[in-house]
UniProtKB/Swiss-Prot annotation:
Cystine bridges: none
GO cellular component: cytoplasm; nucleus
GO biological process, one term: tRNA modification
Record's subcellular location: Cytoplasm; Nucleus
Name of the protein in question: tRNA-queuosine alpha-mannosyltransferase
Length: 445
């Protein structure tokens, strides 16, 4: 095995990426730690891996997420330190919002800076992630009382590049209501085009949004599903593997499908809003749920599905809102089965983000692929990914738009998304990751 993949936080998007890389690369070996107690993983994972990764003369490349303190690992294991070292940033700690800053929090961002200095290639999942990290280094280091290091941005920047997080969009045709079939056909067509030209288009520069394509043949000649199967099968994996589709289980689903499918083709049924994010303060559930409660007080008709993972400390607003929203709630809580999760997204009309912290946003793109109309803050990574039509500047603007949508849900259901999801697909990006990981290291590394 010539490629060592290390993931100190093996869950969520971190795990998704690693699993895709393992499918693409035969010549790799994976070492992981479970996705819990993030702060302890960031502090101590390097020592653990230094003792548990066996030595091998065949290793050529090391790939790790920025949770790992790469500097410590390279010092503890000089044999690993000599490899071509690739550091991938899903998020960065220099601009992470904390409830109450403590001096110990400095160490997390500092470790990421040190890891960049040791790495040979530093990869970010978005231009926003890269620029927010690099341009914050100077300000961040001013927290040091004296004898501060200098010029680190200029040292690190030449190593940096953007390769978007790759999403394997699954086969959702069997979940799609008829009014979304034209949308799905367009998504599959554009993903296929992106796969064919994956090595041509560069990632956008900071401040530049992913370019739009004019939809060709968006309107379908038929409202039937069968011909979607062949298109999807060809896109599940750029090579031969076809596990991108979601298996239909014979077991009883935790969700009752009739709850979602009943009246799915009624254009005047209540607007279905979904919020598919972690139940933590950095995703700002308070803003979202307070807006919904205000809509409820105005006697506006809507349904809501609040998805996403929950952890030990769940914000109090969730229990308060669930009670206040009452019969408007269709689903409340995390859906561990992917088919249940995508079923909800396909039946929903609008997907909302209220995040204070987002460097990519897998859940929003998955929902858009499933035909949801996105509403996102005009901040963070969102302007890089979504056209201006789908961005809001204030909670008041979000509330106003949702009020309008509640009154005319039929208009939203006729809407065809004007942006792109294709540049973020595994079909489009797998070649870039393969090239990154299989290119021979320079002789002077």
């Amino acid at each position: 095995m010539s490629i060592v993949i290390i993931e100190a936080f093996y869950g969520g998007s971190h795990r998704q990426l690693v699993e895709l890389l393992r499918e693409e690369l035969d010549d790799c070996v994976l070492y992981t730690l479970p996705a819990k107690k993030w702060h302890w993983r960031a502090r101590t994972a390097a020592l653990y891996f230094s003792q548990n990764i066996p030595s091998s003369e065949h290793y050529r490349t090391l790939f790790a997420s920025s949770v790992l303190n790469l500097t410590e690992l390279a010092a503890l294991r000089p044999d690993l330190g000599k490899l071509k070292k690739i550091l991938y940033f899903h998020e960065n700690q220099l601009v992470y919002p904390v409830k109450k800053y403590q001096e110990r929090d400095f160490q997390y961002g500092y470790n990421q800076i040190l890891s960049c200095l040791v790495a040979d290639v530093v990869v970010f999942n978005s231009s926003f992630n890269m620029e927010s990290f690099l341009t914050s280094i100077g300000k961040f280091l001013k927290l040091i009382p004296d004898h501060r290091p200098k010029d680190l941005e200029s040292i690190i920047r030449p190593k940096c590049q953007v390769i978007y997080f790759p999403i394997r969009f699954p086969d959702v045709s069997r979940f799609m209501p008829k009014h979304k079939i034209a949308h799905l056909r367009r998504m599959l067509s554009l993903i296929g085009d992106a796969a064919a030209s994956q090595s041509v288009a560069p990632c956008p520069q900071p401040g530049q949004r992913v370019s739009e394509k004019s939809p060709e043949n968006c309107e379908s000649k038929s409202d039937e599903h069968p011909d979607l199967d062949a298109e999807q099968e060809a896109l599940d994996n750029p090579s031969v593997h076809k596990s991108g589709s979601l298996p239909v289980s014979k077991e009883n689903l935790p969700l009752d499908p009739s709850t979602l499918l009943c009246g799915a083709e009624d254009p005047q049924r209540p607007l279905h809003i979904t919020w598919p994010h972690r139940w933590e303060h950095d995703k700002d559930p308070e803003t979202f749920l307070k807006i919904l409660m205000s809509l409820k007080q105005l006697n506006l008709n809507f349904h809501v599905s609040v998805l996403g993972e929950t952890f030990t400390d769940t914000p109090d607003i969730f229990s308060e809102a669930k009670k206040a929203l009452g019969s408007s709630v269709l689903h409340w809580g995390y859906l561990p089965r992917k088919e249940d999760y995508f079923r909800v997204l396909c039946m929903a009309d609008v997907v909302i983000s209220t995040a204070k912290h987002e460097f990519f946003g897998v859940a929003m793109l998955e929902a858009v692929y499933c035909g949801c109309y996105p509403l996102c803050p005009k901040a963070l990574v969102y302007p890089e990914i979504f056209p201006a039509e789908y961005l809001y500047s204030t909670p008041e603007q979000l509330s106003k738009r949702l009020k309008s949508f509640c009154k005319r849900p039929d208009i939203i259901r006729k809407h065809l998304y004007k942006g792109e999801v294709a540049p973020f697909s595994w079909a489009a990006l797998h070649g870039k990751f393969r090239s990154l990981l299989t290119t021979e290291p320079r002789e002077d590394l």
